């Protein structure tokens, strides 16, 4: 381009900066500066993003700090995203809270920063300010706020937010957000609302099914969790490792030893899955709690890798509970 006498502009620079090699990035940045395109918001944001993607975080932050916040809204959002990535949450707030030209993305980044930093009340205050300023919230803000409700067991807030998402028709109630809702209702003890939200979903995936199965197990409905696991298979979803962990956990809590062992033993043949440590922990705990210590001993002995400290502790507690002292697994 340069050899033919055609000078790059903000569009070509933005395109060049999408995925450059590190050496090329430095050269492009130098050319951007020489040609005076530093002040173009999309070019500046692309430079910050490229530095961050090459793990040159200090360069990204240093460059972003030289820009005018009021004239580079997109760049400030990208810079705030980098601060979030390196857990400098207070810097995110300093950067965006006093900026007069925040957009929906800016507000969402602020809410995410507060959520990750444990400032739950502040996150909802910012959400309120966002709404007062007339900005619609997006899926990122929804996910952060619903996650706060889950962690703080705030069912009223979570349910209200769900209603607001539906009422405003914000377009953010996609499968991902719906899955967060399922998790929130389940962990807040409202399994009926979890099941209702699931039935209202259009784009269910394996995560949706797993959230319901985990929720049923968490709330003491082990038999229902097992039934939903079977329904998931009938609906055409092949269980993944997380889904199997969820159903094994439900069998553990409900004492469904026969059903749990059947799923565990057929993981490879039925689902093409190799049992992982988490599966062994569930199975050993299930067997030990129900007094099947010999069977637990066999499972531990046949493990293809070294048992974890959790497995040993679980097994020893089972031996102590049932007064068994002649386990051969140590020999």
Question: What residue spans do the PLM features occupy?
Answer:
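Alpha-helical hairpin repeat boundaries in alpha-solenoid proteins
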Residues: 1-28, 32-331
